[in-house]
């Protein structure tokens, strides 16, 4: 069929489970059990291999350059792959489609810019939580459809660009982003902003809420120094013709002097709980 699931009981023995014919023809591998450098080196010699699912391997340390110069197009980085490790940099290959839960959680030495490849589809819960030395622009590719709770909590990025594939911004996804500056644009495709999603962030430009937004969760934008987004948005635009459901007041009258809504929607906003 071109695809095979293999359980590797002893690290370094993957080649024992793959016949000579399979080595030449397999397109996809789903691996469980234990792997080491010898197993990754073996996979690099498989000329037709395009997809590797590592989500259920037991030992989660992935060697540097493990897929360099290989034919692999799709890789799943497993849960806890580098969690609480001392890695200082990461170059995520373009073949990666999924980053598992807590994959880089609490990697306090991981520093610099983070480039998320086009083609990435899923970022798990706590994926980059408490990676406090990650800085610069954070761009979520349009290909990403699933973001996990606390995925970028307690990082130090300066700007945030959200892709158009996201429909939900989950709980505390970007919370405690103390270095965020400038504008925040929520794409039209986003329907729900969950509790605490941008809690204690420091944006200081304008905020645009997309036309598809239906609900904003509790303390989604509440912050330390301001009731709305902890920074000081100078203008807020909400493109939704029907007011999104709010879990509490935004108190925008205390922190922002301008709220823009679509033509013909002013009366509806003024009549809606927490917006009026």
Where are these regions (language model features)?
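Membrane-proximal C-terminal cap and juxtamembrane stalk of leucine-rich repeat ectodomains
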Residues: 250-276
């Amino acid at each position: 069929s071109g695809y095979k699931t293999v359980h590797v009981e002893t690290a370094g023995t993957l080649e024992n489970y793959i016949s000579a014919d399979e080595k030449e023809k397999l397109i996809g591998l789903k691996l469980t059990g234990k792997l080491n450098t010898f197993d990754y080196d073996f996979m690099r010699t498989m000329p037709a291999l395009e997809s590797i699912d590592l989500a259920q391997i037991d030992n989660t340390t992935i060697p540097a350059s493990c897929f360099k110069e290989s034919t692999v197009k799709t890789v799943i980085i497993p849960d806890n792959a580098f969690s609480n490790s001392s890695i200082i940099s990461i170059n995520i290959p373009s073949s990666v489609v999924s980053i598992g839960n807590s994959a880089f959680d609490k990697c306090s030495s991981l520093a610099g810019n983070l480039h998320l490849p086009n083609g990435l589809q899923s970022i798990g819960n706590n994926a980059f939580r408490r990676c406090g030395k990650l800085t610069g622009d954070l761009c979520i590719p349009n290909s990403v459809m699933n973001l996990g709770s606390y995925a970028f909590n307690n990082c130090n990025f300066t700007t945030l660009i959200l892709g158009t594939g996201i429909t939900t911004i989950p709980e505390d996804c970007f919370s405690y982003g103390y270095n965020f500056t400038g504008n925040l644009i929520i794409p039209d495709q986003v329907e729900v902003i969950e509790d605490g999603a941008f809690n204690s962030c420091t944006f200081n430009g304008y905020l645009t809420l997309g036309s598809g937004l239906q609900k904003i969760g509790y303390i989604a934008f509440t912050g330390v120094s301001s009731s709305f987004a902890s920074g000081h948005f100078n203008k807020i635009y909400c493109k939704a013709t029907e007011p999104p459901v709010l879990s509490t007041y935004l108190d925008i009258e205390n922190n922002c002097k301008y709220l823009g809504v679509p033509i013909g929607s002013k009366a509806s906003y003024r009549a809606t709980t927490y917006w009026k």
